[in-house]
From Swiss-Prot:
Disruption phenotype: Most mutants arrest as three-fold embryos that fail to hatch and those that hatch arrest in L1 with many animals appearing uncoordinated and misshapen. 7- to 8-fold increase in blmp-1 levels in seam and hypodermal cells. GO terms for cellular component: cytoplasm; nucleus. This is F-box protein dre-1. In mid-embryogenesis, expression is most prominent in epidermal and intestinal cells. By the 1.5-fold stage of embryogenesis, expression is additionally detected in neurons and other cells. During larval and adult stages, highest expression is seen in epidermal seam cells and hypodermis. In larvae, strongly expressed in the P epidermal blast cells and descendents that give rise to the vulva and weakly expressed in the somatic gonad, including the gonadoblasts, the anchor cell and the distal tip cells. Some weak expression also seen in adult spermatheca and uterus. PROSITE patterns: FBOX, ZF_UBR.
Length: 936
């Protein structure tokens, strides 16, 4: 009987081949459709084994004689004949059985011949014969099928022993078959197809061959990814992974025989595997380096697109597969390695044990040569190095060296515990370094020099015994989203005209500074977070000129940005806060541009310019700092323009010890001390600023301070708008000083200066108060609408008053105390309210006019009968009324308030309508100078 009549075989392909032809099955993506499998011819290999070799997809046997296990150009392995229908006595035809599955098999029309399946969808192999061996199919062409013959057929049908075997037993049998036989079995029957494509069978084969415990996805050259079974689109990930990897050769410390793969090749040295692959141009260059420590005789030289990947049954494959060099560089990539791959391997260099035992020899060897764990050199060296652990235990040479325009790609690698530099990139080399960890190296984690320009992204560089990243001698580089921390010296050091880009990195917890730019270093540092460093977050020195933009610099144990030694740079749009010292320091003739920053909540000052520092400081917001918002001292002369300086816990802007510079168009407000303080020889120019809300006045000039204040608005300060005291001599010109809660300008303690063309109005006390031996010059000022006198001169002071206008002041235009003789020329005093004179005329106590908020100037007396002291003063009307008949004496014409009316004497004032308690009287408080010293 023809096998084609059996329902246990699938329909053959159109092409019919000779049964004697030797065939090998091929791999198909659809493991559930045996009719789609094809086969190819096999040539016996040396030693009697069948040799399977890689062939590019789509090539024919004629084009490539090396067609192998998974070729798609083979044919069906059996010679099959066409099926004939079963004839009946009544000349009715049975339905031809055209499908191998029960779902597609129609029922016969005759009861006398019925096919029974063992199970739905299960294919079977049997023949139908009578007792004499005559083929029943032929007999049925002319005779009727009898019941006895039908019973014989059923009895014979029950003899299908193979298909009646338990599935566990078949799985056990299949677990011993090689991949070639498994693929062949998949075309025998549906049941064989299911079992030969089961996960258990292919997983055991896969693990024995590759040692992996997770399927390795290898869709294209130099791309490898371990994927859990649930992430594979194919039905059998183990089988699919084997299809992708079966062309590879294996390197083991102790090569083993594996009979389950027809393509299996195993060597004990990487060099031998490389030589084998170079001889076969059609075979994929793929090497599996298995568990163990592999010690090459000399450097492993890679100048092709070979792929080398670690293979181990350990969860940590990388640490289980070690390539160790001891006499020379362990691994070198040169020209031709543009598409090479190296992954999941530990690479390390250790000195030869003989050299280690003889230190002198080791020292001489190190002086003569540099040794590396991995060396990538020359222009066309562009390997992909992935998930490797790299270290070097010699003091002369980096773990990784990239030079001479090489451009490798390192990804998910570690470079740890090296005795020298971690990664050394030089001589115009580039490359990509992503998701790497570089840590605990004796010298810098990364060296970049000689115009090298690598790309680092999402790397962690930490715990080094030196610098984290060191760029020097025109080195460049792009560092993005790296985490650089806990290095003994700076996180990043830029030197000798190096010019890197550092963007969106974190630089923190350095044992010294965060970023150190010196010796004409440059660089662009943008959108980084720089914090918790022991020294300054960023140091710029010795003619360096970096760009610092949009960074967060905070909680440093010293300052935020420190610029000295004639440093320059652009510091722009940064958020600098919470540092132990000044947010920005500029010293020793440095001249940066500082603009659009927020500098706030520091434990020290905001910006500190000293030791002849300069710089353009504009459009910054400086607030909430413990000490002065901006300090300018020791010969410094910065330009401070359009800044907003506010809410400080001391002074807004503080010039001292020969501090100079230009303070222009700034908003300075709401400080606990003065808005601006000038002292000890400082001589800034302060122009077009708005200064308000100072709790200790607007501007305080003292201790020999100078300065030129022009065109400013000084208003709404708790004390005087401008204080001039202790031998200070500023120039005030064209300012508007108004709405002060004390006087407009107060000049004390030998204060001098020139007040010219100012408008002083609506202040709570005198527009200008001159006292205690002071001698200023007032020229062409307008003092008006004051709630006290326009100008008051008292206590031994004098002044030169020229062409001033004093009008609409409450107590009078000009009030001069006894013994004061100012120089007056061309002043106009008019339309003042003269409230004091009117009160005297109407018999009012002057305290009724002034209360305890101001000090009217008039004749004041003391009463000897009431035992008043020199500190007490009584107005004229109280002497006439309350102390009539007492012994009194004139004190002087001066600024007092009436103690009788204030209720501070034992006698009750008869001129007060209601009793008053002894409120604390008010006097112009002494201005508070900053407690900050001259040293940080």
């Amino acid at each position: 009987m023809s096998s084609s009549s059996s329902p246990f075989f699938h329909p053959p392909p159109q092409q019919v081949m000779d049964d004697t032809t030797q065939q090998s099955p091929s791999y198909s993506q659809n493991s559930n459709s045996p009719s789609q499998h094809t086969f190819e011819s096999m040539e016996p290999a040396a030693g009697g084994s069948t040799s399977m070799r890689y062939s590019p997809s789509g090539s024919s046997e004629a084009d490539n004689p090396t067609l192998g296990l998974f070729s798609a150009q083979a044919s069906y392995p059996y010679s099959l004949r066409k099926r004939r229908p079963c004839l009946t006595k009544d000349e009715d035809l049975c339905f031809p059985i055209t499908a191998a599955t029960a779902d597609e098999t129609p029922q016969p029309t005759m009861k006398k011949f019925k096919l029974e399946c063992l199970s739905p969808g299960e294919a079977r192999d049997f023949s139908i014969e009578d007792e004499s061996g005559t083929n029943l199919e032929a007999k049925m062409e002319t005779t009727e099928c009898e019941p006895e013959e039908e019973e014989a057929v059923e009895e014979e049908d029950q003899q299908d022993h193979i298909n009646r075997l338990p599935e566990e037993l078949l799985l056990k049998v299949f677990s011993f078959l090689p991949d070639k036989s498994l693929l062949a079995c998949s075309s025998v029957s549906y049941r064989f197809n299911q079992i030969s494509n089961s996960h258990e069978v292919w997983k055991e084969l896969y693990c024995n061959l590759y040692d992996y415990r997770i399927p390795l996805f290898h869709p294209s050259h130099a791309k490898f990814e371990f994927r859990e079974q649930s992430r594979w689109r194919d039905g059998n990930p183990w089988k699919e992974s084997h299809r992708q990897l079966h062309h590879g050769v294996h390197v083991m410390k102790e090569p083993r025989v594996n009979l389950r793969s027809v393509n299996y090749r195993c060597f004990d040295q990487i060099e031998k595997a490389q030589s084998f692959l170079e001889e076969d141009e059609y075979r994929e260059k793929l090497i599996f380096l298995h568990t163990g420590v592999h010690e090459p005789i000399d450097t492993i030289l890679i100048n092709t697109d070979v792929q080398i990947i670690g293979a181990s049954d350990s969860r940590d494959i990388t640490s289980s597969v070690v390539l160790e060099g001891s006499k020379n560089t362990a691994l070198t990539f040169t020209d031709g390695s543009a598409n090479a791959y190296f992954g999941f391997i530990t690479v390390r260099f250790r000195a030869d044990p003989v050299c280690r035992q003889q230190p002198q020899i080791a020292q001489q060897a190190q002086q003569m040569n540099h040794f590396y764990s991995i060396l990538v050199t020359d222009k066309d060296a562009m390997p992909y190095i992935e998930r490797c652990d790299i270290t070097s235990k010699v003091g002369n040479g980096a773990a990784v060296c990239v030079k001479k325009s090489a451009a490798p790609k390192f990804k998910y690698c570690t470079v740890l515990d090296c005795e020298n530099v971690g990664i050394y990139i030089t001589d115009n080399a580039t490359g990509h370094y992503e998701h790497c960890e570089i840590a605990r190296n004796t010298l810098a984690g990364v060296w970049v020099k000689n115009h090298a320009n690598p790309y680092f992204r999402k790397c962690t560089i930490h715990s080094g015994k030196d610098v984290g990243v060191f760029t020097f001698e025109h080195g460049q580089g792009y560092f993005e989203k790296c985490n650089i921390h806990s290095n003994r010296i700076s996180g990043i050091e830029v030197k000798n005209s190096a010019n890197p880009v550092v963007i969106r990195c974190e630089v923190h917890h350095g044992y010294t500074g965060g970023i150190y730019v010196h010796e004409r270093g440059r660089g662009q540092f943008m959108e980084n977070r720089i914090y918790a460093n022991a020294y300054a977050g960023i140091w710029i020195t010795s003619h360096s000129d970096p760009t610092i933009r949009k960074n967060e610099i905070f909680t440093g144990q010293q300052g935020g940005v420190y610029i000295f030694g004639e440093g320059r740079g652009l510091i722009e749009q940064n958020n600098i806060y919470g540092n132990a010292l000044a947010g920005i320091q500029i010293r020793s003739q440095s001249d940066p541009i500082v603009r659009l920053n927020k500098i706030h909540d520091g434990l020290h000052g905001g910006i500190y310019v000293h030791e002849k520092g300069r710089g353009l400081i504009e459009e910054n917001e400086v607030y909430g700092n413990t000490l002065a918002g901006i300090w300018v001292t020791t010969g410094s002369s910065p330009i401070l323009r359009k800044n907003r300086i506010h809410s400080g816990k001391q002074v807004g802007v503080y010039f001292y010890d020969q501090g100079h510079g230009l303070l222009e168009e700034n908003d300075i407000f709401n400080h606990l001390y003065s808005g601006v303080q000038i002292r000890t020889g400082s001589n800034p120019k302060i122009t077009r600023n708005k200064i308000w809300g100072g709790q200790n006045g607007g501007v305080l000039v003292y201790n020999g301070g100078k300065g030129c204040l022009e065109d400013n608005e000084i208003f709404d300060n708790a004390m005087a708008g401008v204080w001039i005291k202790t031998d200070s001599e500023p120039t005030l010109r064209r300012n508007k000083i108004y709405d002060g809660r004390d006087g407009g300008v107060c000049i004390f303690n030998r204060g001098k200066g020139l007040l010219e063309d100012n408008e002083i109005f609506r202040n709570a006390q005198a527009g200008v108060l001159i006292s205690t031996e002071s001698n200023p010059t007032l020229r062409r000022n307008r003092v008006f609408d004051g709630k006290s006198a326009g100008i008051e001169i008292t206590n031994g002071a004098t002044a030169t008053l020229e062409e001033n206008q004093l009008f609409r002041n409450k107590y009078g235009g000009l009030c001069v105390a006894t013994g004061v003789t100012p120089v007056q020329r061309g002043n106009r005093i008019y339309d003042n309210h003269d409230t004091i004179s009117r009160a005297i005329k109407t018999g009012l106590c002057l305290f009724k006019v002034s209360s305890n908020n101001s000090f009217p100037m008039h004749n004041f007396y003391r009463c000897t009968t009431c035992n008043t002291t020199e500190r007490n003063a009584i107005c004229t009307n109280c002497i006439r009324t309350c102390h009539r008949g007492h012994s009194v004496e004139l004190v002087r014409f001066d600024r007092f308030f009436c103690d009788c009316g204030a209720g501070t004497l034992e006698r009750h004032c008869h001129l007060q309508n209601v009793p008053r308690d002894n409120d604390t009287v008010y006097d112009s408080a002494t201005p508070i100078s900053t407690e900050t010293g001259t040293e940080i």
